[in-house]
Amino acid sequence: MAILLNVVLFLPLFGALAAVLLPRGEAAQHKSWALLVSLVTFFLSLGLWFNFETGRTAAEFQFETHLPWIASLGIGYHVGLDGVALLLVMLTTALGPIVILSAWNEVQERVKEFFIAILFLETAMIGTFAALDLVLFYVFYEAILVPMYLLIGVWGSENRVYATVKFFVYTFAASVLMLVAILYVYFHDGGTFDYVAARQSLQVTPAVAVWLFAAFAVAFAVKVPMFPVHTWLPDAHTEAPTAGSVILAGVLLKMGTFGFFRYALPLFPEAALHYRGLIGALAVVGIIYGALMSFVQTDMKRLVAYSSVSHLGFVMLGMMAITAEGLTGSVYQMLNHGVSTGGLFLLVGMLKERRHTRLIADYGGLARQVPWIATIFVVVTLSSIGLPGTNGFVGEFLILSGTWLSRMKAPGWYAALGATGVILGAVYMLSLVQRVFFGKLENPENRHLQDLTLREAFVMVPIVVLIGVMGLGPNPFLQTARPAVDRLLARMQSAEQHLRQQDPSLREMVGTEGPALALARPPAVPALPSPAEGSR
Amino acid sequence: MVTNQDLLALLPFILLGAGALTMMLSEVFLTSGRRAYQSGLAVLVAVAAAAAAVVAPERSLFAGQAVSDGFSSFVTVVACGGLALSVLVGRGWLERRGIERGEYYALALFATSGMVLLGMASDLLVAFIAIEVMSLAVYALAAYPRRGQRPAEAAFKYFIIGSFASAAFLYGASLVYGATGTTLFSGIARGGGGGLLTAGLALVLVGLAFKVAAVPFHAWTPDVYEGAPTPVTAFMAAGVKAAAFAILVRGFLAMVSGTGVVGGAQIGGALGILAILSMVVGNLFALPQRNVKRMLAYSSIAHAGYLLVGVVSAGTREGRQAGISAVLIYLAAYAATVVGAFAVVAALERTAASPDVDPAKAWDIARFAGLAKSRPALALAMAVFMLSLAGVPPTAGFVAKLSIFRAAVAAQQYGLAVIGVLTSVLGAYYYLRVVVAMYMQPAEAGEESETAPVTVSVAVALAVVAVVALGIGPESIAGLARAAAQRL
């Protein structure tokens, strides 16, 4: 089955190369071709989903391919998926056709280049999640910048050049130091860029590990984005075309949180424990700051962009809790955010296509004119604010309870302050719904608007279905993520053990104090017995 | 005694020299005015010389004054590749302006033969001769169009500063000879002579620093790069830089690897400072440039800084292998990219009615506005070159930067690595500005666009292929570079 992952990974790229040959003038051909390629990619990726094993004997990384690439520099082509990477790959391939379909009418200029950029982007995104070689990961991670830069800069709205240059320079600047850290790792793990081997044999002093973690963390924190390095996000989101916003919110931001989960924490667990309080605090600040900023926005896209800052704060908070619940919730919230915020950007894009404005004040009382759009908007909003029964609830509940139960210093404060973000979220999102869809229809231009078209229904139905399925039956998703979560937890526990051997006065830091939720217990991976339990 | 094997090792040099002489003779005797064969012959000679270099036997030549090895072969291939591409650019550019002559190609071939010899030199005097062979030809090339102010000014500046650098080099070589009684690199490695040797080596390095355009010996670069005819600028950026770095690496390694050498570490430290200055100053000065040709000139200073990082790393025990191969990979990647970029600049250059008209506006970034609409292929190529110069994957520039910084980390030069990556962010900003202009700004009104000459398009296409191939599958080049580094 290993070949399947490679096919899923490179199919969009080859689709993009083939699209180069199609005639420029035939916009419809380009649209259909891109849709076809992304649909085939999605159906093939379902094969990954159904063949992934989560049992006790299952390998950590599945569908692995390991080939030499630049052997004389020690760089290999090594790809494979664990549960978390699989979920994010599925999110990417599922959003692919949705994004392409949503851009059907919006993009009128340079249609050919637009869809080539989208397909190129899809390969780079899947590659980022599938890579198991540090340089290969970096290559995909950086290769995303170019098509995204063009998407915002060429097809964006008025202030696009400023936004896209800011986006590029911010993320490029943040990630170059990670390259130096990767090179340092190479010379201290026996000379390999291979992630699995590096994780095993990395030998660095704690003082150096703190710097290396910082280099990785800065790169990922900008991508997440965490407060206070989030300022590129509102601009990029606001100026990007709908498809760009959806990809940015749906997948690109996850590359930051995934980076923490896959690279920064497992490679430098002790340094991660060192920085945990700081990152957790920044996450909480991000939650509240993002929510407050959302509340005062007059521009719909900007509002949703700031709500992303708030939601990604939850993801980071759950990760820093370093409990089974927190980590699981964090992974789940990555998916939720991709679905619901992606959905919100799609809906905002539909309104904008009809009225050519993003200002909230230009709308009002639309519920009568466009009942279907309004209904779906409300559903997605409820998911975004975490109403029980929707996917958002599962993620936020796991994160907050995981934080509450965690052995951070003052976990109650983190959880309580984080929980205010849920309330603020309800306030700004519901007030958005109210100002756009309810109240009096005062602007005459809003009187005759088309409701959901068939194409748009095809775009939105998968989102709504996912919101319901992931809200009511989260288990398949949680089970898929669980082995990876348990492994990370075991790794963190052995780091804690190591620290406490050196300094017995240290208290326990990983896992929960009391009996945990049934969701994530007992450990699914007996192959890696947690050292903390052994010592008791 | 010169044996057949020696001749075989020197074959690239001989081919280039013979090609140049043939070109000059044919220009005299064949006066039909049809000159298409000349560029074809020059490309053919370049390819043949590169092929000869690949199969050249490894041996010591001229009683140890030169050596043919993997390193010299690699440099020869890069120089010949730069020659072939810039000849293609030159053909179209010169023909449009009606100034195509055999001498142009002859001078380029002579210059390349000097570069090839420079890649082989393991003796200060041979190095000096090679530098002069190369430089005299390039001075003449810079002034090639003869009419017009800028080429003359550029050539004059280049000549004066170049003579000064040569004089410094020669004076240094004489001091080294006085101190050690030999000009062989192997003799330098034995050391002795104390302060006199140090002074001599310092002067030699100053001479070379001028040639590679490292800050603070860079002041000539922007004016010369801007003023010289664009195909010549491409040739200078690709070939002259490669050859100068080849001799710098060989000489510097001899200085630091010897047992009794004075202050090998200090020399490394001095080069490290030059590297930092070049990266910072080159990038900072490139930032405000609106003239693309001048921006590329400043960026070439910054790239000299990155290359110096590799050289410094090669001077340490841990980073020796990684450093040498990184410099070679970087030279190959930079040559392909920069020739391509200048080829695009040449393609966009207006053919002025009279050469006395100042063409500075021809290189303004406004010329690139809307290029993605009017000429999508050219714009795409330029975007690839800009991303490669900025070091964004998956291009050659990324692999090159990766190997340079890998060498720096191997040599535990963390400061150089961190300054290197941070300054490369500045680079991303000004390279992107060209992409912004091409893809995100409307074209200037009333801008008629001439189609690019065929040979220029061919050169651009070849360069794009090279840049992307090096970015995606660099193993063949990286393997060759590593083999070359192991033998050096």
Model region roles, listed by residue range:
Chain A
Residues 1-11, 81-92, 134-147, 209-222, ...:
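Structural signature of hydrophobic alpha-helical transmembrane segments
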Residues 6-21, 35-48, 89-103, 121-123, ...:
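Central hydrophobic cores of alpha-helical transmembrane segments in multi-pass inner-membrane proteins
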Residues 25-28, 113-120, 124-208, 293-306, ...:
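Alpha-helical multi-pass transmembrane bundles of energy-transducing inner-membrane proteins
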Residues 1-4, 21-116, 192-200, 508-533:
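Transmembrane helix-loop-helix hairpins at membrane boundaries of multipass inner-membrane proteins
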Residues 52-75, 176-231, 235, 260-278, ...:
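Juxtamembrane/interfacial segments at transmembrane-helix boundaries in multi-pass membrane proteins
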Residues 16-27, 96-108, 150-159, 224-238, ...:
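C-terminal ends of transmembrane helices
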Residues 16-21, 46, 97-101, 123-127, ...:
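Alpha-helical transmembrane segments of multipass membrane proteins
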Residues 227, 341-344, 413-448:
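Predominantly late transmembrane helices and immediately cytosolic-facing juxtamembrane segments
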